[in-house]
Amino acid sequence: MDFLTLFGIYVAVVLTCIALVCKYSGHQQTPLGQLVGAFTRIVSPCIPQWLQSICYRTMHRLFHQRNNFFLYLHLLLEVVVYGEFTYEVFGFCLDMGSSSLSLCVPYILLALKSCLFYLCCSRDPGTLTKSNLSAHLKIYQYDEKLFQQGMKCSTCQLIKPARSKHCRVCNRCVQRFDHHCVWVNNCIGAQNTRYFMLYLLSVCAMAGNIAVLTTDMLLQTVLRTGLLHAHYIDEQGIQQPAGPLFIIQHLFLTFPRIVFMLGFLVFVFFLLAGYCLFHFYLVLVNQTSNEWFKAKGHNCQHCHPYSGHNCRTSYNPFRGFYHRGILKNIGEIFWPLRPVQKKEN
């Protein structure tokens, strides 16, 4: 199996994973999610009904019911990446003169990430109960647009505080609900958003750090073996200089596991970097991803066919309602607002 075939399989697997996440993790409103939905509607008539039924039940189980599948997958991917890094890359880097301190950084990041991962999985996100409901009703004001006073959760039968939402996966209402993360098998809410943000940063740093070390190892290999000045004989028997594609293919055939790992890490890094930037934006404007998606579904009240008033497509009339200034917005993530306790005399 040649390089291009393996690379095509790799790209197909990655795109399939992205499609599944967009389709079944509540991101149908995003452009990518809408594209996946349109593709699904076109392809579904060609798939047998029994196979569609099996796929639907499987995806529903994975993405809409609490389970440990993604926890185990998360740990498996880490074991594979760190196993390959320790088994091959670490030794090559030492032989090529990399410092022991720089090679220890990925393991330090792994320890930090493991602590944050545990906190994300185990800490209560801010579950609303009958006993704490009255206090949580006073934390945030209702904007009467996205969150209206007096609305009751049809499942929990509790009055919904502003910025709260019922998670259909965990079957509970959560204060300042952001989203349900399948990778930590927990909701992200007022009390654990800080851990989730740091967890995202740590995973992004891990992927980036190992990718940089691996790239440096491969570059050193290219320089030391003289591949930049090498030549090869093509199918017509003509001598050709080794270009970038030839060098990449040679590295892939020489270090297949390392190159696959590097491709996976680069993909994870850029995916998480974009996700981190999105959540940092939400932190700065004091908004949750739930509010961001809900606000996109609300049009400006002045926009109707005969008004002559047209807002930009990115117009969001509710973005600033809970905005308290950048520093206070950041502080609200790391020191969540809590109900005021009345002192008893």
Swiss-Prot record:
**Family named by the database record:** Belongs to the DHHC palmitoyltransferase family.
Any single GO CC term annotated in Swiss-Prot or TrEMBL for this entry: plasma membrane
Q: What Gene Ontology molecular-function terms does this entry list? A: protein-cysteine S-palmitoyltransferase activity
Q: Which residues lie on this side of the membrane: Lumenal?
A: 1-3, 90-100, 216-257
Q: Which reaction is the catalytic activity of this chain?
A: L-cysteinyl-[protein] + hexadecanoyl-CoA = S-hexadecanoyl-L-cysteinyl-[protein] + CoA
- Compartment(s): Endoplasmic reticulum membrane; Golgi apparatus membrane; Cell membrane
* EC numbers on record: 2.3.1.225
UniProt KW keywords: Acyltransferase, Cell membrane, Endoplasmic reticulum, Golgi apparatus, Lipoprotein, Membrane, Palmitate, Transferase, Transmembrane, Transmembrane helix
The record lists the membrane-crossing segments as 4-26, 69-89, 101-121, 195-215, 258-278
Looking up InterPro entries in the UniProt record yields: Palmitoyltrfase_DHHC, PFA4/ZDH16/20/ERF2-like
Indicate whether Transit peptide appears among the record's keywords: no
Q: Please give the function described in this protein's UniProt entry.
A: Palmitoyltransferase that could catalyze the addition of palmitate onto protein substrates.
| Gene behind the chain | zdhhc4
Per the record, the domain comment is: The C-terminal di-lysine motif confers endoplasmic reticulum localization.
Q: What is this protein called?
A: Palmitoyltransferase ZDHHC4
Q: Motif location (Di-lysine motif)?
A: 342-345
Q: Which residues form the active site?
A: C181
Instruction: Give the membrane topology, semicolon-separated if more than one.
Output: Multi-pass membrane protein
